């Protein structure tokens, strides 16, 4: 009979993502001037206000006001009509120094023996249903948001778009867990009030005309551009172009009030969007605003790196990797693997987990070094998910009061590199 599976994504202007991007912008600025910074930065955004709180231990200084205003402006909140804009929003800082007790558990005489910054379990997942080794429903939902944001920034089509938006994609699977079609696509996008009651004859007529226009543009502009610009597999292109897809566009009928004025946003509230869209599992720890001594972040990236390379090497078609840590302890407490019965080698999941232990050094310091996590790479992760992107180099410029500007070339999304495939094949005799 098969089944349906659904995942969602959100835009850069979603309130929770605004908060994530501010937290990671603060983190990046501190790491740019002091790579050994310890940071836990939490942000709340609401009508006309940004509150930044958390714990920091660093030799760098962050110009919080400039960082916040630049981040909000880059996202697109630049108009007073939004009731949250980069020029006028109030900014409150409640940042203080990191606890000595936590710092004592992390610092060691030898950096290699650096302890984990907290306890917890972290998961990495990969499958082979997309070329990014990501689940198809989340991959498509993310592609829709990336394309919609590109359209908004270009300002040539769908010129009524505002920054806040969400997507949701429901995929049909057969009994063998193979994607066979797309059942439903949902797009909710904030928009200007581009047809007035005076022009339409009544407010109801204006709302209906705006909704009809947005629905048409989603189907005739957003979907074709997503297929052309984001989807590379012929089978998935065909699925997305099918005539029998059910479309839900702005189901409430109108979406003018949005962003932090419509909903208060908090750092760390989109952890499923940030990872695998509900596939696999999640340990509960958020990523944004945390330096890599926090294994919530660094070990989740390491687990994704392991999972992706194992699937790419042909060990399994699907895999979930769990790592667990204790605060102050360097070595992981446990390594767990689940291949869902889809392994291609004559080994049990437990035996695969032992291979993982020998192939990958999973101490926090080793993860930081291998994935280059002590560099200012995090703002880019806070939008459109932390997993599934192409690794790339980028030159970034940072400003700090009393110091010359700093230009740094960084490598983004290192945990998406397929640099362990050959080692894994050799270890498994493939």
Specify the residue positions occupied by each region the protein language model found.
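Glycine-rich, mobile lid/loop segments that gate access to catalytic sites or pores
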Residues: 6, 66, 73-257, 388-392, ...
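N-terminal, positively charged regions that mediate nucleic acid binding
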Residues: 1-40, 45, 421, 427-430
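Internal helix-turn-beta structural module
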Residues: 46, 318, 325-430
């Amino acid at each position: 009979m098969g089944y349906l599976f659904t995942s969602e994504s959100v835009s850069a202007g979603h309130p929770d993502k605004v908060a994530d991007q501010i937290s990671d912008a603060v983190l990046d600025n501190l790491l740019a001037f002091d790579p050994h910074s310890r940071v836990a930065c939490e942000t709340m955004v609401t009508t006309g206000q940004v509150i930044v709180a958390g714990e920091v231990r660093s030799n760098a200084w962050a110009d919080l006001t400039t960082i916040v205003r630049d981040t909000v402006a880059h996202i697109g909140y630049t108009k007073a009509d939004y009731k949250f804009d980069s020029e006028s929003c109030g900014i409150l800082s409640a940042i203080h120094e990191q606890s000595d007790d936590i710092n004592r558990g992390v610092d060691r005489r030898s950096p290699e023996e650096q302890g984990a910054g907290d306890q917890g379990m972290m998961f990495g997942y990969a499958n082979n249903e997309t070329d990014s080794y990501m689940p198809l429903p989340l991959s498509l939902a993310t592609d829709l948001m990336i394309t919609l944001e590109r359209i908004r920034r270009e300002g040539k089509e769908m010129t009524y778009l505002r920054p806040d938006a969400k997507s949701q994609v429901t995929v049909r699977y057969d009994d063998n867990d193979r994607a066979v079609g797309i059942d439903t696509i949902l797009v909710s996008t904030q928009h200007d009030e581009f047809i007035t009651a005076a022009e339409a004859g009544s407010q109801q007529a204006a709302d209906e005309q705006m909704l009809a226009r947005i629905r048409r543009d989603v189907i005739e502009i957003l979907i074709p551009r997503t297929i052309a610009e984001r989807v590379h597999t012929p089978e998935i292109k065909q699925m997305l172009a099918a005539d029998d897809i059910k479309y839900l566009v702005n189901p409430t009928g109108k979406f003018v009030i949005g962003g932090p004025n419509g909903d208060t946003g908090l750092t760390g509230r989109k952890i499923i969007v940030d990872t695998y869209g509900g596939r696999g599992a999640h340990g509960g720890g958020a990523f944004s605003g945390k330096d890599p001594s926090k294994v919530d972040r660094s070990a989740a990236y390491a687990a994704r790196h392991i999972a992706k390379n194992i699937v790419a090497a042909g060990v399994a078609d699907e895999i979930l990797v769990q790592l667990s840590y204790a605060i102050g302890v360097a070595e992981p407490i446990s390594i767990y693997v689940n291949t869902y019965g889809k392994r291609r080698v004559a080994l049990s999941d437990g035996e695969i987990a032992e291979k993982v232990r020998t192939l990958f050094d999973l101490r926090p310091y080793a993860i930081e070094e291998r994935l280059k996590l002590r560099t200012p790479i995090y703002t880019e992760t806070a939008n459109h998910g932390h997993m599934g992107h192409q690794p790339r180099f980028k030159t970034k410029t940072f400003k700090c009061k009393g110091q010359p500007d700093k230009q740094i070339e960084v490598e983004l999304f290192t945990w998406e590199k397929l640099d362990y495939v050959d080692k894994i094949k050799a270890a498994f005799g493939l």
